[in-house]
């Protein structure tokens, strides 16, 4: 699919018809979830955050709203929606959940489930200063271009680990966020 013609309807039909394949068995047991907020527009957007610089883990990194499942969450989807409300003030009832992607292991020991949801374009996003330093929207067509992701093999605790890297404007997108976006691009089948 040509990215210049990526409408929300095209994205939805391809997302629903082309189900993701499990690429590997996850090893981590602690559960977390992130929301992949697709902004409902004729040319859809993707809402991303930049984590606050003072955080202990992943400080300053571009990320999806999300976090660990807690005892009040009825499901992984509920956890993603709760975290999105806490981090960027997206009301759970404003999200039209369209599905989930296969879980991904994080280097911090979590099994992270990406939840894909459609959000209205007129939401007054507000970053929680405790967790988020910036909220920005990237065109979905750009996020789903496979050619924008570049591999880097790193070694951590004696093991080789492939990390994906990309840029959008002045934001450096890498690690789990870039990996999730790349997997979504592979599923949707968008060509540069």
Swiss-Prot record:
GO terms, biological process: nucleoside diphosphate metabolic process
Domain Nudix hydrolase per the UniProt entry, residue ranges: 29-160
Motif window: Nudix box: 67-89
Cofactor(s) listed: Mn(2+); Mg(2+)
Keywords associated with the record: Hydrolase, Magnesium, Manganese, Metal-binding
Binding positions (Mg(2+)): 83, 87
EC number: 3.6.1.-
GO molecular function: coenzyme A diphosphatase activity; magnesium ion binding; manganese ion binding
CDD domains the record matches: NUDIX_CoAse_Nudt7
Family assignment from sequence similarity: Belongs to the Nudix hydrolase family. PCD1 subfamily.
Record function comment: Probably mediates the hydrolysis of some nucleoside diphosphate derivatives.
Name of the protein in question: Uncharacterized Nudix hydrolase NudL
Gene name of this polypeptide: nudL
